[in-house]
């Protein structure tokens, strides 16, 4: 057995397709195409030319392989010998093209079309362990002398002896060139960007009742036989199998007909996802901090001090013993000293934070001040992958603990080379993506950020850096989006499913999204200070600003994709699903500006028809989604552009009218009654005071989603990868 790359005769050593090497090459998965069992289709164009000199395309699967490689797969061929566990060890997907005796087809001329018993066992074991298998059958299947049916039968499918004809739904008026019809509301979206697929002299498939199978393509009601299965997807143990009733549709002379190529890529993606799906729920190994005595001693002391501290971080001697607080602080300082050698690169910060902690004690545990040490905490100056940083401050955690308690956290910087290269284009010197190594209770919450302004200081600290916990962002997104997918019966394209199952891919996606989003706050036509969190403005202004940055990032993915960026398509799914499924139902209903942004996006997509909510099932018109999101981005940008010539009050009103054009306001809203009911001649705060806590209630879709996913949302508290 050898592996050969397409358009090459060089033998590839097994070490060259090791998973770690593939990760560096950023390939989706490894596809192995069998060419050792007298296949009627050749991957090698030279072999195809020998098989059919007059029309090599009628014997070639070269374009089949090249399409997969262009999509991000590695494609190799198995050209000699038996299919064994060793032969399959470097593959994620095995493709078995139609095979035949020489009596019926011109073939590659290698091996027997009959799989040996040991091969059948090896292939089944490969699937059980999480492999993907594609079996390509044919019309009048039994006559070709292969035993693909024996293999397909192990997964509950049979390729029947038939030829489908359709005089109404066919290609080029040929009755045997039938157009398949897709089950649009299937578990997986094999019809993603497939308007039509043509099969050429197809057989039909039969499925046993016990198989965990889904028929995703059938013949039409006008065909003979009518509504017969043409494509079947099976989930078998940890693996996946697809059986097709035709092999011609992926040949070189047919793969570019209709949307046959896209169908092949959808199938390949779904099969490849078996491996990521099997690993989706695995937790990463615990970090060193989980068992480190020094860190655990620090956590113990911090948690013991937590109930002593007031909201501002001080400790009231009338309620709590300062002697006990002092003893606990000694334990904190001792633990910091013990941990210091592990963070030698932070020696200046650690020395300063010890002084700040001691000054807190000497000041009678009054309101703490960590300004001096915060100025020396600079993770932005050492953005290298896997660099760990230690921090201890009196601080609140955004979307977590609102009180300025003493908190300790150890972070690991996520800064792979590819991200460093991206930052050269999307420059953002303050951006520091991080992962959790260890944390105290303030981060056992929904908080996924670490910002300087959360720290207790005597004056506003310099904004040198902003930390984003990409592991938490990715993990909670995956959990909520998967639950929403199941609840809403949403069929997912293969790329979207891969994103939801792959933690590292999701982290990479969120980091690039965050990088572009964050810098967008200071770019564009800005009728106000975008960093307005401390200003008193209507909460829909915050909603529009956060939404603007996400919409702009979504649009930028089209630029990235044109440049060949592998993450662009995943970013679009992440922005769409996080905004639609998680944001609106996370947090309370008190002026929830992030939630409102998701409500606006849903309303626009529903209004334009890019999103449909019918029969309690959610569906997207994926081509329309992109255009609709870009349109919404342009509308928000126009609102901003025109706002430069408006007063602040006029912009608030214009923004309100924009939002209410999509999201219905509360029936009791004063703002909704019109400008004549607002105190426009008074102070602006009077206008803000009239805003209801839930000015824009959840619609019936989100009301249902909120009730049914409440436990899932709650379960993401404190989540890590």
Task: Indicate residue ranges for each PLM-predicted region.
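Short, surface-exposed patches at the edges or C-terminal ends of soluble domains, predominantly
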Residues: 3-283
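Post-HExxH zinc-binding segment in Zn-dependent metallohydrolases
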Residues: 159-162, 538-572, 657-670
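N-terminal low-structure segments adjacent to metalloprotease catalytic domains
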Residues: 279-405, 678-721
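Contiguous, non-catalytic segments that form substrate-binding/exosite surfaces or channel walls
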Residues: 337-497
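Short pre-active-site segment immediately N-terminal to the catalytic Zn-binding motif
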Residues: 496-513
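Long, well-structured alpha-helical subdomains associated
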Residues: 507, 558-658, 672
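Active-site recognition of the HExxH zinc-binding catalytic motif
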Residues: 510-526
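C-terminal, non-catalytic "cap/extension" segments appended to globular domains
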Residues: 627-721
């Amino acid at each position: 057995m050898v592996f050969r790359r397409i358009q090459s005769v060089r033998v590839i050593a097994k070490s060259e397709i090791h998973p770690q090497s593939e990760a560096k090459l950023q390939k989706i998965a490894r596809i192995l195409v069998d060419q050792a069992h007298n296949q009627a289709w050749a991957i090698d164009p030279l072999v195809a030319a020998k098989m059919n000199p007059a029309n090599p395309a009628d014997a070639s699967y070269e374009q089949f392989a090249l399409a997969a490689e262009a999509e991000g797969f590695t494609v190799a061929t198995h050209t000699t010998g038996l299919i064994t566990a060793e032969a399959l060890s470097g593959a994620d997907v095995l493709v078995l093209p139609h095979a035949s005796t020489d009596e019926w087809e011109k073939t590659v001329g290698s091996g027997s079309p009959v799989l040996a018993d040991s091969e059948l066992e090896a292939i089944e074991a490969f699937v059980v362990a999480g492999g993907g298998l594609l079996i390509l059958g044919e019309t009048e299947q039994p006559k070709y002398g292969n035993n693909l049916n024996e293999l397909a039968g192990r997964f509950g499918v049979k390729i029947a002896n038939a030829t489908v004809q359709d005089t109404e739904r066919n290609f080029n008026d040929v009755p045997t060139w039938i157009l398949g019809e897709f089950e649009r509301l299937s578990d997986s979206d094999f019809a993603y960007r497939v308007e039509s697929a043509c099969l050429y002299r197809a057989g039909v498939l039969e499925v046993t009742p016990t198989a965990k199978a889904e028929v995703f393509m059938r013949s039409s009601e006008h065909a003979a036989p009518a509504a017969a299965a043409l494509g079947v997807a099976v989930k078998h143990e940890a693996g996946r199998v697809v059986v097709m009733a035709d092999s011609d549709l992926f040949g070189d002379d047919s793969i570019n007909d209709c949307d046959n190529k896209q169908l092949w890529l959808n199938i390949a993606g779904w099969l490849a996802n078996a491996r990521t799906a099997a690993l989706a729920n695995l937790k990463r190994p615990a970090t060193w901090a989980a068992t480190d005595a020094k860190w655990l001693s620090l956590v113990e002391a911090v948690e013991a001090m937590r109930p002593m501290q007031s909201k501002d971080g001080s400790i009231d001697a009338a309620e709590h013993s300062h002697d006990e607080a002092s003893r606990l602080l000694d334990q904190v300082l001792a633990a910091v000293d013990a941990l210091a050698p592990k963070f030698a690169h932070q020696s200046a910060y650690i020395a300063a934070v010890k002084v700040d902690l001691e000054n807190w004690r000497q000041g009678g545990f009054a309101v703490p001040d960590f300004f001096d040490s915060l100025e020396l905490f600079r993770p932005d100056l050492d953005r290298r992958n896997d660099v760990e940083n230690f921090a201890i401050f009196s601080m609140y955690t955004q979307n977590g603990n609102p009180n300025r308690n003493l908190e300790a956290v150890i972070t690991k910087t996520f800064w792979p080379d590819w991200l460093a290269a991206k930052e050269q284009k999307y420059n953002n010197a303050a951006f520091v993506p991080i992962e959790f190594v260890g944390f105290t209770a303030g981060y056992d919450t929904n908080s996924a950020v670490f910002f300087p302004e959360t720290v207790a200081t005597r004056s506003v600290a310099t904004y040198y850096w902003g930390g984003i916990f990409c592991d938490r962002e990715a993990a909670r997104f995956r959990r909520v989006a998967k639950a929403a997918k199941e609840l809403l019966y949403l069929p997912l394209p293969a790329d979207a499913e891969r994103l939801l199952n792959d933690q590292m891919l999701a982290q990479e996606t969120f980091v690039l999204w965050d990088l572009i989003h964050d810098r967008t706050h200071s770019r564009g036509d800005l009728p106000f200070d975008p960093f307005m969190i401390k200003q008193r403005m209507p909460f829909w202004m915050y909603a529009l600003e956060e939404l603007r940055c996400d919409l702009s990032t979504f649009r930028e993915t089209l630029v990235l994709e044109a440049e060949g960026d592998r993450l662009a398509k995943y970013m679009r799914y992440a922005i769409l699903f996080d905004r639609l499924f998680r944001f609106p139902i996370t947090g309370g209903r008190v002026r929830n500006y992030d939630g409102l942004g998701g409500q606006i996006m849903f309303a626009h997509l529903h209004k334009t028809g890019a999103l449909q909510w019918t029969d309690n099932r959610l569906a997207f018109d994926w081509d329309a989604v992109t255009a609709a999101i870009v349109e919404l981005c342009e509308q928000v940008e126009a609102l901003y552009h025109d706002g430069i010539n408006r007063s602040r009050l006029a912009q608030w009103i214009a923004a309100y009218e924009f939002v209410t054009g999509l999201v219905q306001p509360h029936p009791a809203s004063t703002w909704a009654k019109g400008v004549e009911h607002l105190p426009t001649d008074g102070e602006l705060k009077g206008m803000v005071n009239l805003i209801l806590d839930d000015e824009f209630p959840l619609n019936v879709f989100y009301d249902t989603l909120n009730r049914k996913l409440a436990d899932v949302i709650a379960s993401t508290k404190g989540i890590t990868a």
